[in-house]
Amino acid sequence: MNICVVGTGYVGLVTGAVFADLGNDVVCVDNDRAKIEALKAGRMPIYEPGLEEMVARNVGDRRLSFTTDLGTGIRHGDVIFIAVGTPPKDSGETDLSHVEAVAAEIGRCMDRYKVVVNKSTVPVGTGELVREVIGRHQPRPVEFDVVSNPEFLREGSAIEDTLRPDRIVIGAPTQQVAMTLVELYAPIERPMIITDLPSAEVIKYASNAFLAAKISFINAIANICEAAGADVTQVMKGMGLDPRIGGAFLQAGLGYGGSCFPKDVDSLIHTAGRLGYDFKLLRSIVEINRERAAHLVEIVAKALGPLDDKTVAVLGLAFKPNTDDMREAKSVEVVQLLHAAGATIRAYDPAAMDNAKRLLPAGVTFSDSPYEAAEGAHAAVLVTEWNEFKYLNLERLRGLLKRPVIFDGRNLWEPERMRRLGFAYYSVGRKPVLPA
């Protein structure tokens, strides 16, 4: 099948590469000329395990190509995926200007019947907006259909999530139109939900909002555990074994970040308000999430005392492991708060330091290893739970720190082990461990 994918971010590039790998002829389009030239040269604009090899393989087999010419891509594709950014406005409303611009160009360039697929995360009603914009910009009437096919990939495992998703959601005006997507996805052999277009749009937002709710809920429980002397990890296990609840996303820590959850929750709150419903539950979820970084820094300040003469090693900057994405990363707020309190910051991340340099305060030192960051520091603060940190030589780390103090924002290590190693160890929703 001939496919055009508009947008080469995480969603668009992975979608295009996977469909090419399944044997389709894919053209990926982006208006960022530097990004397209880099892709043509085999350089990935994002960090995603396995993506570079998949792109190279399919470019070499002439199933995948890249261009800045949107018209060329539109004319090529029987199916056109819109996978452009949908950033939030200050109000929380989703900015659909990129989606509308692509829809207008599709209308102008459409030369035969097309299926236009919204892959971007968009509010309910966007499919109808896209249909109206395309129709309005057609120089002559050409039939087309608009479908919603939301993505559920996770950065760091995007290829696996695209090839083996939990479910494939197809929102289409008719069963006949849906069958085009069913045929395209047939090699993947995963459960498919075929529904109407508005329902598919709501499924995406409702899914992300519910996962955000689980994260904020267990973080609120962690606050209770800290005050009561309970262990949130045991509470999580006891809850997660209930099949009605499940353990996924029931992980206390610094809260959610990234390119999806924060903006999707805000967008759903805004959409609900536009439709006449005050989504108070989601407002509470957002408020709990906003408190997490400040809560950790308060614990740091209470344990270390005044921070204006302290050096702190910050381990992990990306919003989660296995990505270089700094969007809504909790590290930004943690570092800003520590810096504002006078602390000297040394930071390390396996993949995200180049992106972090544009966001963190001037004066932050970026280290080449966690050990370099820790040398002579008064404490280490773990923000992102990379596997590299899980397997650190903690004896070496203790010897490098001026004081053996660790603040673990992700509950990466076991308190009893840290006690045996002689650390003062502060984690989330658990009693502090203090050396004898």
Which ranges hold each PLM region?
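Structural/interface elements that position substrates and couple domains in central-metabolism enzymes
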Residues: 1-436
